[in-house]
């Protein structure tokens, strides 16, 4: 169980990073959103030009240009670009917007060099500039989003949750992906009930927006109900998952839960559904289903499943499996096939 939890925690981290596309942190000068307009001071033309020169050093391909136009030639290395920007932040006459844009570009530079601690520091300075002056709302939101993503990526989950709270206050409305991140951060902190609250909120947001639930968003509920030992809700969500995302792992999990609850008919139906969808690929799986069908007193179906497994070369033709086949045919009163199976089994004795 601990191994499975560790694997899921790793999977959660990866899925969150993919969902938020951390690598897509951008450097574009942010524009105001349609809310109460902020009176943001302008960026001087000379500063903008110097920032562009630094950006070219950091990543020439990030500069906007016409289709087919080559990337500009940098006049230094990415580190040179960062050093240039750092010097510019020391100027005394910078307004809050200029300072925030400089630190935003520095965050891009540090991220390009894969220096996560300095990237975080730079984004913190973007937010700090907004505390002492006025910066664009879009840039502040971008910085806060980057901060909760980056802190999550280095397993600083409490810090990530703090920045999420700030981002949500600024955003003014729910966001399913962010609520999912809150849920997974609380999961990593083993705050399972709090995590479940946000996991359910994800579903509420999705339904309100008339969207489809993503697979990993729904599966998180399964994991959390399991942690809380709420087996009825584990089953309820799995029953939905096998319809919306009919994968073998969910069917197997559901069948196992039915077995645990001693709902043998449901368990057998689930295993047979897996088989009918062509999801069984192992000898042990087909033999298990055949034995379950035999125990349920449907020997003809048990024989059919096993015979097909032998034909498909999934089931090994050995004495044990052929004896089982012979027993199935005997109990289904198909004596000709039973005799044939007994004879085949005797060849391996």
Where does each model-flagged region fall?
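C-terminal structural cap/anchor segments
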Residues: 317-349
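Generic helix N-cap/helix-start motif at coil->alpha-helix transitions
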Residues: 45-52, 96-103, 135-146, 171-181, ...
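Solenoidal tandem-repeat scaffolds enriched in leucines and small polar residues
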Residues: 166-277
